[in-house]
Amino acid sequence: MMKPASLQGFSSHASSSIYSDVRRPATTPSKMAAFSALSLCPYTFTFRQSSRIKSTVSCSVTSAPASGTSSSSKTPRRRSGRLEGVGKSMEDSVKRKMEQFYEGTDGPPLRILPIGGLGEIGMNCMLVGNYDRYILIDAGIMFPDYDEPGIQKIMPDTGFIRRWKHKIEAVVITHGHEDHIGALPWVIPALDPNTPIFASSFTMELIKKRLKEHGIFVQSRLKTFSTRRRFMAGPFEIEPITVTHSIPDCSGLFLRCADGNILHTGDWKIDEAPLDGKVFDREALEELSKEGVTLMMSDSTNVLSPGRTISEKVVADALVRNVMAAKGRVITTQFASNIHRLGSIKAAADITGRKLVFVGMSLRTYLEAAWRDGKAPIDPSSLIKVEDIEAYAPKDLLIVTTGSQAEPRAALNLASYGSSHAFKLTKEDIILYSAKVIPGNESRVMKMMNRIADIGPNIIMGKNEMLHTSGHAYRGELEEVLKIVKPQHFLPIHGELLFLKEHELLGKSTGIRHTTVIKNGEMLGVSHLRNRRVLSNGFSSLGRENLQLMYSDGDKAFGTSSELCIDERLRISSDGIIVLSMEIMRPGVSENTLKGKIRITTRCMWLDKGRLLDALHKAAHAALSSCPVTCPLSHMERTVSEVLRKIVRKYSGKRPEVIAIATENPMAVRADEVSARLSGDPSVGSGVAALRKVVEGNDKRSRAKKAPSQEASPKEVDRTLEDDIIDSARLLAEEETAASTYTEEVDTPVGSSSEESDDFWKSFINPSSSPSPSETENMNKVADTEPKAEGKENSRDDDELADASDSETKSSPKRVRKNKWKPEEIKKVIRMRGELHSRFQVVKGRMALWEEISSNLSAEGINRSPGQCKSLWASLIQKYEESKADERSKTSWPHFEDMNNILSELGTPAS
C-alpha cells in the first residue's frame, strides 16, 4: 500500500476558486515533481487527455523497475498544484477521482483573458499574463447597433479593470485605430496611477490628442517603442515587429518570459508594395519560429475571404486613373485613418493639377498627428480652405470627405441631405467610394447612396474598380503566416465567433494540433509543451469572469446598460410613452368624490384617429373617481397608471411607459359653488366666504406689515379675487365640456352600442386598484385628526407667513464687491500648485487637491474657495501660453518666470 506521505506532490483537496491573487514564489520549480525516485516508487504515471478542454493526470500501479536498470535517469522535480475533475485508469479499469491543475502559482504559467474583441468586431482589449502579473494589450471601443438607441460608444468593463489594477503592470497598444485606442480615456483612470502606456510614435500622437480632449494629462506615463527593439513591460520582454495595415506604425508583439513565448499579431495583412516602403517583416517571423512560439494569437477578420489582398499601390493607380478621366469635380470618401490612401489621393491631385480640399474634422486630426510624427504625405498648410471652394472651378477641385460609413454628422452624409455648409452635390460631380462597408452599416450606407443617386452625381464603387483594399489579411495570407510561425498552440482573435471557428479549422489544417476558441471573459491557461507534466495538451480553462459592457452616450454620460437605461430607451422607442398630469381638487362641502384636471400626452404611439386617446381620458377620470377622498397622491398615480397601461395593451398590444404626475390644488374652488356665487345665490355664500377667508387670511396679515409702496387697495384685492374665481369657473367648465365631448364624439363601431364602448375601459377599473386596508386605516386617521388641528394650523400658518413677510421686508439685496486677487496671493497659489503637480496627474480627485490649496491659503489669512483657486490656475495657464509666443509679454507679465519654472520643468499642466 502506498503511504500517504508519498502523495504530497498533489493537493488533497480540489478548489473551484478562480484567479488567485497569490504571487508566484521566486523559488518555484520549473518542472513537475514525481512522488519519489522512479527506482523507489511502485507507480507509473501516465497522462491522458480528457474529453474536456482541461487535462487530467492519471496513475496506474506497475512493478518497480530493477535497481540496476536505466531507470536511474534524472528524477523529475516535484510541482504542487490544485486540481479537480474525474479521470479513469485504463490499465486497471478503476475509476478514480483525479485532480487538475488550476489557477494561482501552481497553475499554467501563461494566462489569457480577453475583455473584448472576441465574438465581435471592435472593442479589442486583452489581458496577457505570466501567473498573476499581466499586461493589457489594446483598449478599443465598439460602435453601437440599432438596438442601443442614443449610445455613441461601447467599451470594455472598466470596473473589472479597476478591480484588477494591482495585477496590470503595463498597457501596450498595437496601432491607432479607434477599436484599439478609443477606450483609453476611460481605461487609464481605472488603472494604477503609475501604470505605463507603450505605443509607437504615430500611435502615441493619436493617444495624446484623445486624452487631451478628455482632460487627461499623463505625459510621464506615455512611452514610445520602435520595431525590433526590445523593452520590458510587466513580466514580459516585448519585441515589436513590423506588419502592414491600413494605418502607419502598426506592430505585432512578441512576448518573451521564462515560461514561454507569445506572438500577438495585432491587425495585419501582407502588402508586397506598401507606399511607405515598410514591408511585412517575414524575416522576423522566421527568426521567432526558430526560437519557438508557445502561443500565437492572430487576426481573424477576413478568414472567410479567399485569396490574398491587393496592394495599396494598385489602389493608388486606380485613383489616378479615375481622377484623370473625370471632367467635373471629384469627391472621394475613405477611412480618415488611412494615411497611405490620403497620400495616393494627393498624388492623383498633383498629376491632374487639381487643388486638394479636406472636409471633415477626423481627416485633419489624423493628418496633423502624422505631420507631427513625420509620416504625413501632405503638408496640412498646403490644403485649400473649405470656405474657398467656391473660388475655384469644379474641374480644378478634388474634395476629400469623411462619411464612408454614413455617420450622422459626417461631411458626405450631410451633403446627401443637402445640409452641408461646405459644399453642395451636383449632377456633374464624380464620387469615388474608396472604402469598404463595415458589417452592420449596410443599410444606412445604402440609404446615403440612394440620396446621392437621387441628386445625380456619378458614383464609382465596388470591388472591380480596385478603389479599396482591406487592411486585414485574407485566407491565403493567414495560412502563409501560420506555416511560417508553426506555433505550439493557436488562439484566433479579432472577429465574430464564426470567423474564430473558421480560423481555428484553418490552423488545424496547417498541422497545429492544439487550437481553441474562447469568448470574452473566459480565462485560458497555456503551458509550453515541454512542460507536459503540467498540462498534457497545453490548454486549460481557468474559469469565467462575468464582464459588463460600458456605454457612453456623450462626453460625460458613462455607465452600464442599466445605469444608462438602455432597455428602457429601447422599450419607449418600440412601445411609446404616456405622460399623465393630474391636478387634484379635493371635494367641497356638498361633494364626496375627487375631481381633477387631467392632461394626457403621448409619443410614439398609434392613437387610432383619437379613439384610443378618448378611451384613455375616460378611464383616467373613472379611475380617479374610484379613489377615496383621502387617497394619497402616490396611490392615485399608481392606480391611474395601471389602468392606462392595461387599456393600451388590450387596444394595440403595446406596453408603453406610463409616467403619472399628480399635484394637489388646495386653492381650487368647486365648480357648483363658483357658479352659485356668480349667479347671486345666497345659500352658498358662506361656503365661498369661508374659502375666501382661508385663501386671503394669510395675505392680509402679511400685507399689513409690508411697506406702504407695496400695499394694494381694497378694490384691487376684490378685483383680483373675482378674476381668480372666474378663471377657476372657466377652467372647470372647460373640463366638463371636454369630458362630455369625449363621451359624445367617440365613434361607436357598427353593431355595437355606446355601453359596449364604455365597457372597454370600465373593465380595467377593478378592486385591485383600491387602497389596501392599512392604507384606508391611515387615511381615516388623518381625516379624523385634520379638523381638530385646523384652527391651530391656520393660526400657526398665519404667524409663519407674517414672520416670513417681515423678514423679506427687512432683508434687501446688497451689492457684492468683487474681491480681486492680489499679486502676493497669486504667487502663493502658483507655488502651492507646483508642489502638488505629481498628485494632480491622477485624473480623479483633483477638487480635493484644490480644497487643500484653499485650506492652506486660509491658514495664511487668505480666504479663497477651491473653485476660485482652480479658475485662477486655468487663467494663468492661458496667459502663460499666450505670453510664450510674445517676447514683450514675457518681460511685462510679472508671473511668467514663476509659471515657466514650473511648467517647463513638469511638462503638460493638469488643470
Curated annotation (Swiss-Prot):
- Explain what the UniProt record notes about the effect of disrupting the gene for this protein: Defective embryo arrested at globular stage. Impaired chloroplast development due to a disturbed formation of internal thylakoid membranes during embryogenesis. Aberrant embryo patterning along the apical-basal axis. Disrupted transport and response of auxin in embryos. Silenced plants exhibit chlorosis and slight disruptions in the cleavage of polycistronic rRNA and mRNA precursors.
Give the gene name: RNJ
Is Hydrolase one of the keywords? yes
Lineage of the species this protein comes from:
Eukaryota, Viridiplantae, Streptophyta, Embryophyta, Tracheophyta
What SMART domains does the annotation carry?
A: Lactamase_B
Family membership noted in the UniProt record: Belongs to the metallo-beta-lactamase superfamily. RNA-metabolizing metallo-beta-lactamase-like family. Bacterial RNase J subfamily.
Composition-biased stretches (Acidic residues): 796-806
Q: Quaternary structure?
A: Homodimer. May be a subunit of the RNA degradosome.
Q: Where is the transit peptide?
A: 1-70
UniProt protein name: Ribonuclease J
What positions does the entry give for Zn(2+) 1 binding?
A: 175, 177, 245, 267
**Which co-factor is required?**
Zn(2+)
Fetch the PANTHER family from UniProt: RIBONUCLEASE J (PTHR43694:SF1)
Where mainly located?
plastid
**Expressing tissues:** Moslty expressed in inflorescences, seedlings, leaves, flowers and flower buds, and, to a lower extent, in stems, siliques and roots.
Secretion signal, residue range per the UniProt entry: none
What Pfam families would the database entry show?
A: Lactamase_B_2, Myb_DNA-bind_4, RMMBL, RNase_J_b_CASP
Residues bound to substrate are: 336-338, 468-472
Q: Where in the cell is it found?
A: Plastid, Chloroplast
Annotated Zn(2+) 2 binding sites: 179-180, 267, 494
UniProt lists compositionally biased (Low complexity) regions at 63-74
